[in-house]
Amino acid sequence: MVAAVLPFDSWDEMRRLYNALNAVWTTRGAEASRYGFPIVWPPENGMRLRAKRVSLSNGSHVFVCRAFRFKPRKFQEIGMASPLAAKLLAPEIRNGIGIFIGRPGAGKTTTACSFIQERARRLGGVTWTIESPVEIDLEGRYENGYIHQREADSPDLMHEAVKDLARATPNVLFVGEVIDDQTAEVVAQASKMGFLVLCTYHGGDLINGIERFARAAGHGNVSAQFVEAFRFAVHIDLRLVDTGGRAQQINDPFISSLATGNPPRILSTKSLFCMADADPIRGHMKKGDFSQLTSEIDRQKHELLKLQSEMNLGRPR
């Protein structure tokens, strides 16, 4: 996060924004605004903000606002290694659960939305998203497919929306960010309907994120429904490049050399796929022995590295 002092001539506008935020919060009520609320500022053709009221120890309060000004990026432009991108877009991944894991600000939503767009473009079908809030505008037709977006203001509304749209039998359902056990459980239940359910989830590393989600869906115990439906998880990390603003020379092809953002960062990914119903991975998960996934993650990475080498050899020099 970068902090900056506002110019003096912006204080009048900040006062108007503060008053507008107070008015919206009062109109909606404390309970309805508990998880934040949307506002457009300035009201005429302004920017979409997500605001949350935070009480202070002295009895006053502040509003924390997050601006959503991202434009969708093409899947080929986010810096993901070609073999991993190709595996994610395989037609065989048409049901189950797929998770994009990472720390806050790691690019989970950007990656997921780019993937959803490209999947709709290539494989077609109908995709529904349920987000709180909608961060990237995806609504519309994409050659062979359609994407429709819906916004939910609270976890309770998110749960109901997932159940509601699950009955519509989409090809893909993107639940956005899973922030509580009940939403994780609803994701696992929705996956039984036979379509692909995607979401993002906070996690410091791949195995930790998978285990935490599995236990969240089972309210402390490993969810059998999640284990049966699990298809893939991708851990995403954005690493700072060197102080000169240039991407570091890294031999790992799963760390992109494409610098992005300010300050410049590069994309690092680690993944795990589980396609077969009888895959031993599921046995380790059911037992709660998630540490055993390490060897399979390494094996799959070796396979992707081999594919990367073959793809490089096939390129014209």
Where are these regions (language model features)?
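Short, flexible helix-loop junctions that flank or precede catalytic/ligand sites
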Residues: 1-317
